[in-house]
Amino acid sequence: MTVSEGIARIQAFRKQVPLVEKNENITFFNLSFQPPMNSIVANTINEYVDWGLYNPNPKPLWQQKAEETRELVAKYLNASSSDSIAFTRDTTEGLNLFQRSMHFQPGDNVVLLDGEHPNHGFGWISLQEAGLEVRLIPSKDIYYADASTFEPYVDEKTKAIGISSVMFHSGQLNNVKDICNKFRPENIHVLVDMTQQVGLSSIDVQELNVSACAFACHKGLSCPTGLGVLYVAPDVLPQLKNVPPIVGAGAIENLDANLLVNLNPIYFSTARRFEHLNKSLITTLCLNNYLSFLMDIGFENIEQYLRELGKSLVDELSKLGVTIIGSKDPKKRSTHSYVAKILNPEWDAFLKNEGVYASQYRDGIRLSLGLYNNAADISRLANTIKKGVLNKIPFN
């Protein structure tokens, strides 16, 4: 698909998001929390319901579709095999499955930014009881992390580094590849939370050289909540504990055909050992259809569209005296997430009252773009902020 064709399809996508297409009074900048429903996903849910209503045995069809989705996710991530992909319930479960599969001794340590997402950070912190030391890097003024960020905190007892590819509160794009290439040869695993990046840019887990990554599918991938993905690099799996942290029938390779329990289970040697037998099949269908839509457009077109829209956002806000935190270098910033340095809590209520939906965090108001956003949304946001200024609401 050419660039012009891809951009045209993105622009047409707004018509498939009724919340923004049919409501002139709503301007939505909150994809990083959860995007509004689109007709691709809604139609998939309706299709699932129809199968359940009128098919006497739909589950095998759904299970087969889930396997097709696994293949599609592997293709998107450029995983060497779909066996490296496990479906989970969310990011938290995926991260914890890896964290609790690692070998470590009391006194070993893991290093992460203190601004890491709580779903990631507290997974490591829960292992303190078993003797793991958690080292937190102060990150108040850090808006980009690479290997040099972690190096002063890493020593011979470091077993892992935890990092988000895109930080939820700032939109910064960390240099995951640099971190992995520096520390993985030192037998330090790098676990990456990619929830704020998937569906919004291309990802190559082999090029990034991650030990493992986990993400939820309800943000950039537009699915209902309840489905996540865990990728584990094939060379890393043999280094993990033999028994997964959560075990059900889905983890067992030698499962008896009559479903009898035996005392000598053989766990899958692949990432499938981390799966439940029953997963959110309805959400795997949604993921299949929406990810297919994105891949058909092409992520190079998606990235270009979002970055151009983001540049317009930054330019318009700068005219109003509003700065965006972090680097202006696109190599250090996500495609879609911009945090305006507006700290006064009055703005959150004011924006919502004006129909502008965003999220306020410790560094300011996060304005996160989706494919349904357009230049008119940027203009409406700017006009709303002008109105707030006229109402004498200070930025800070």
Curated annotation (Swiss-Prot):
Keywords: Aminotransferase, Cytoplasm, Nucleus, Pyridoxal phosphate, Transferase. Pfam families: Aminotran_5. The modification N6-(pyridoxal phosphate)lysine is found at K219. GO terms for cellular component: cytosol; nucleus. It comes from the Eukaryota. InterPro entries: Aminotrans_V_dom (IPR000192), PyrdxlP-dep_Trfase (IPR015424), PyrdxlP-dep_Trfase_major (IPR015421), PyrdxlP-dep_Trfase_small (IPR015422). GO terms for molecular function: cysteine desulfurase activity; transaminase activity. The keyword Transferase applies. It is found in: Cytoplasm; Nucleus. Its cofactor is pyridoxal 5'-phosphate. Its EC number is 2.6.-.-. Belongs to the class-V pyridoxal-phosphate-dependent aminotransferase family. This is Uncharacterized aminotransferase C777.03c. It comes from Schizosaccharomyces pombe (strain 972 / ATCC 24843).
